[in-house]
């Protein structure tokens, strides 16, 4: 199955970052990332109870996420520091639907310390191309809060077109928030 993490190579490696699929033993490094960026990411994510940030919870989540990749339902990628292996960010292609749709949803986050260096734009260019060329997807959908100017600029720079506006779309930081809906569609083949 093309979505299987064992078949996903290292997608990118240079002096700035390594981009590869999540592995079962990544739970410690992802837990460190979540804890170090807890306040930075809180305005853009669902409310998290304190137990969410434990290593045990990270282990359980990682195993579920790896299983979803093994089933071809997701592609979950980590941006890693090439020197120390610490997580700089994440790209999540989830809810992969096959058949006549061939689409997924994209989510992403970047460490506070890694902001403003163009890392996520570079990583998503590589990962989006992989989704189209290797996974055979036709559409990648993403949404962002209207006030999240950084995500808006990033998605626009990658060619994601605005397709709509959804009222009370996702519960973010405890509040049902409106979202701008965007999509990147692969060129017809």
From Swiss-Prot:
Domain N-acetyltransferase intervals: 31-182
GO molecular function terms listed in the Swiss-Prot or TrEMBL record: protein-N-terminal-alanine acetyltransferase activity
EC number, UniProt record: 2.3.1.267
Say which enzyme class the record assigns: transferase
Gene Ontology cellular-component terms listed: cytoplasm
Q: Which Pfam families match?
A: Acetyltransf_3 (PF13302)
Q: Where does it reside?
A: Cytoplasm
Keyword set for this entry?
A: Acyltransferase, Cytoplasm, Transferase
The catalysed reaction is:
N-terminal L-alanyl-[ribosomal protein uS5] + acetyl-CoA = N-terminal N(alpha)-acetyl-L-alanyl-[ribosomal protein uS5] + CoA + H(+)
Database matches in InterPro entries: Acyl_CoA_acyltransferase, GNAT_dom, N-acetyltransferase
Matching entries from Gene3D superfamilies are given as: 3.40.630.30
Q: Which PANTHER family match?
A: [RIBOSOMAL PROTEIN US5]-ALANINE N-ACETYLTRANSFERASE, GNAT FAMILY, PUTATIVE (AFU_ORTHOLOGUE AFUA_3G00765)-RELATED-RELATED
What family does the entry list? Belongs to the acetyltransferase family. RimJ subfamily.
Function of the molecule: Acetylates the N-terminal alanine of ribosomal protein uS5.
Designated name of the protein:
[Ribosomal protein uS5]-alanine N-acetyltransferase
């Amino acid at each position: 199955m093309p979505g299987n993490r064992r078949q996903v190579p290292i997608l990118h490696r240079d002096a700035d970052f390594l981009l590869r699929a999540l592995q079962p033993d990544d739970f410690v490094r992802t837990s460190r990332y979540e804890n170090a960026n807890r306040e930075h990411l809180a305005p853009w994510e669902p409310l998290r109870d304190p137990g969410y940030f434990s290593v045990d919870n990270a282990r359980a989540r990682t195993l579920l996420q790896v299983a979803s990749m093994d089933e071809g339902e997701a592609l979950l990628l980590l941006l890693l520091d090439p020197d120390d292996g610490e997580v700089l960010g994440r790209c999540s292609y989830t809810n992969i639907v096959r058949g006549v749709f061939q689409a997924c949803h994209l989510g992403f986050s970047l460490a506070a310390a890694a902001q403003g260096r163009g890392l996520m734009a570079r990583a998503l260019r590589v990962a989006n191309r992989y989704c189209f060329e290797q996974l055979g997807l036709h559409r990648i959908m993403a949404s962002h809060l209207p006030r999240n100017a950084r995500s808006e600029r990033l998605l626009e720079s990658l060619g994601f077109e605005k397709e709509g506006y959804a009222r009370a779309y996702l519960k973010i930081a405890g509040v049902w928030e409106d979202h701008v809906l965007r999509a990147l569609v692969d060129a017809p083949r």
